[in-house]
Amino acid sequence: MKKTQGFSLIELLVVVAIIGVLAAVGIVGYQQYIDNTKGDVAKTNAQSFERWIQSTQIARSGGLTVQPSACEKKAGSLTDCFTTVLTAAGAPFEKFKNPYTSSGANIFAYDNSTTAFTEGQPCTGRTWNSGSTDNGSNITSAISDAFNTYGLIVIQNLDNASADLNRTDNSLKVGYCDGDGNFKIVADNISF
């Protein structure tokens, strides 16, 4: 009769240790992958917003009807356009979600202050003129917590207080707040 031998305790411990090391390395790599993906989604969302601004500006310049109607060429402030009307049902950004947070997350914010955003500047402490969360709430105050700025799309009026929906040459800067809460520029000086 043949004697059957299994693994010794030492061999089993070595195998468990190797599996533990591989799992630890895999978890760190996976978390980095998730963080990079969130950053890519935030950038893509801001680029989509920029493309919407550019195509809507072309329609407005040509006298065409645009949706939502709050963004048409007419008397009023740009603040009237960059509000919850953009994330309401049937609006261009109805399905937008913030990749960093869940329900109630900040989607975009509009600023017409005299202080321009610069690349890498913290997104906290600004008082927003308007904006929207993904549940339809309006943003009209400062966001003090850096986490709540992650993934936020930022539209800044470079013409400051002279922003007028009746004009089609309002100069805008579009960007987003990255996973560190710092501003990243997507487009500078685009017309609307």
Language-model segments: which ranges?
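Compositionally biased, intrinsically disordered low-complexity segments
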Residues: 13, 17, 37, 177, ...
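N-terminal single-pass transmembrane signal-anchor helix
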Residues: 2-34, 45
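Periplasmic/extracellular, small/polar-rich flexible segments of pilin-like filament-forming proteins
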Residues: 58-192
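Membrane-proximal N-terminal amphipathic helix
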Residues: 35-64
